[in-house]
Design a protein with these regions (language model features):
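C-terminal regulatory/interaction module of P-loop NTP-utilizing enzymes
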Residues: 1-186
């Protein structure tokens, strides 16, 4: 919703009015909403825009727009077990006991990136979509570590890669070349 163009937002604003009527001036027609009409939208910035560059292209939504939304809900990440089930459902080759352990560890890595992001330690976060892509790439390449680097680590700030590699090592039990420990050995 916060990535919409202002001219579109003002059309939506009319629909969000209590009567929800919409006028088509060209046709001299008034459209009345169905009694069960509902409008849902997502907004990563909750209408506040984005000064960090994480959600580039979003706009600040004016207070008049925000006031017309009757319900605003915040959706955080799913519980660990539910996220594991979703990844397994999307990448069915992991539907084994060993596969579930790997997916669980992948979700643990994602959870650490989310905590690190919220604490300001890193600037990139793993979404459930990224975990699914990591699982798919790991399957394609036959290598979980390479899948991680190709899917997520290579997108991260170079200064943060050692910390993110540490997250990986903690959860996956495998050292990456990007980790601080590996760099110290070289």
């Amino acid at each position: 919703y916060d990535a919409g163009k202002p001219e579109v937002m003002f059309v939506i604003q009319r629909i969000l009015e209590s009567d929800g009527k919409f006028t088509l001036l060209d046709n001299n027609e008034i459209i009345n909403p169905h009694p069960a009409f509902r409008l849902f939208a997502t907004s990563n910035t909750i209408g506040q825009s984005d000064n960090l560059g994480i959600y580039h292209g979003t706009n600040q939504i004016n207070q008049g727009q925000m006031d017309r939304w009757n319900i605003v809900a915040t959706l955080n990440y799913l519980p660990h077990s539910q996220e594991v089930e979703i990844v397994k459902a999307k990448v069915d080759s992991y539907n084994t006991e060993e596969g579930e352990k790997i997916i669980s560890a992948m979700v643990d890595v994602a959870s650490l990136t989310r905590s690190g992001f919220m604490n300001g330690d890193i600037s990139t976060v793993m979404s459930p979509r990224t975990v699914i892509t990591w699982a798919e790439n790991s399957q394609i390449f036959g290598d979980t570590a390479f899948g991680f680097r190709a899917t997520f680590l290579n997108k991260c700030d170079e200064m943060e890669r050692a910390l993110i590699a540490e997250y990986y090592q903690r959860c996956m039990g495998e050292e990456l070349p990007e980790s601080a420990a590996s760099a110290a050995v070289v």
